[in-house]
């Protein structure tokens, strides 16, 4: 009967289709995957809005329905070179409203749905607001001009010691303040 649980016992690693039938009639279907480590087969989705009133449970339900085990948090950071420096609420570089509490609520809800949360971060992107601080670490073209992207993002040498120390510390703050389990490190 509906509402009762069924135990499959111990299953070997692999993917399984599950059908709920009443005689020859299929009432519902789903799938499951058994793995020692979900990183072996990442099923990846993304989130791109973090307004204070976001329905995080709806996102978690969709992640569960689609069997996602990893979710990238795209465009969540305050600035490319200052990921969590904007306080609890701010506008991202594209002027979208961000609530860090919404980010944290999403991370918790997605964890309950079986998904790990990965913050997006640009490995060597610096916005115009922070460029003066980092222009000594600029990645230069052959003609001596700095590389840039779209007029809003400057490119620094990812091996520059000061940048690397800053970037690693910024990622650590994201783990401590947000709860991310990892990062999608973009290289453009």
Predicted segments, located by residue:
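A cross-family glycoside hydrolase active-site/sugar-binding cleft signature
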Residues: 45-48, 72-74, 118-122, 184-186
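Beta-strand-enriched, solvent-exposed domains that form extended recognition/catalytic surfaces
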Residues: 1-37
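A general structural detector for well-ordered alpha-helical segments in enzyme core domains, enriched
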Residues: 58-62, 99-106, 170, 174
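Aromatic-lined substrate-binding rim segments of carbohydrate-active enzymes
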Residues: 77-127
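An acidic-aromatic substrate-binding cleft motif
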Residues: 27-79
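Active-site-proximal loop/short-helix segments
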Residues: 78-81, 85-88, 133, 179-188
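Active-site-adjacent "subsite" loops/lids of carbohydrate-active enzymes
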Residues: 38-39, 48-52, 119-178
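Short, well-ordered coil/turn segments that N-cap beta-strands
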Residues: 67-69, 111-117, 179-181
């Amino acid at each position: 009967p509906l509402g009762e649980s069924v135990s499959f016992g111990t299953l070997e690693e692999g993917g399984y289709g599950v059908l709920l039938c009443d005689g020859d009639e299929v009432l519902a279907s789903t799938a499951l995957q058994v793995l020692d480590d979900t990183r072996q087969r990442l099923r990846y989705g993304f989130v791109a809005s973090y307004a204070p009133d976001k329905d995080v449970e709806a996102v978690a339900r969709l992640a569960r329905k689609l069997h996602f085990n990893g979710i990238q948090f795209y465009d969540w950071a305050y600035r490319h070179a200052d990921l969590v420096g904007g306080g609890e609420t701010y506008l991202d570089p594209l002027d979208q409203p961000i609530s860090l509490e919404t980010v944290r609520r999403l991370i918790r809800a997605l964890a309950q749905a079986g998904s790990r949360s990965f913050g997006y971060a640009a490995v060597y992107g610096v916005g115009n607001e922070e460029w003066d601080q980092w222009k000594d670490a600029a990645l230069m073209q052959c003609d001596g001009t700095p590389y840039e992207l779209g007029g809003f993002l400057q490119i620094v040498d990812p091996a520059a010691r000061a940048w690397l120390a800053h970037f690693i510390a910024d990622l650590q703050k994201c783990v401590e303040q947000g709860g991310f389990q990892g990062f999608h490190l973009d290289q453009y």
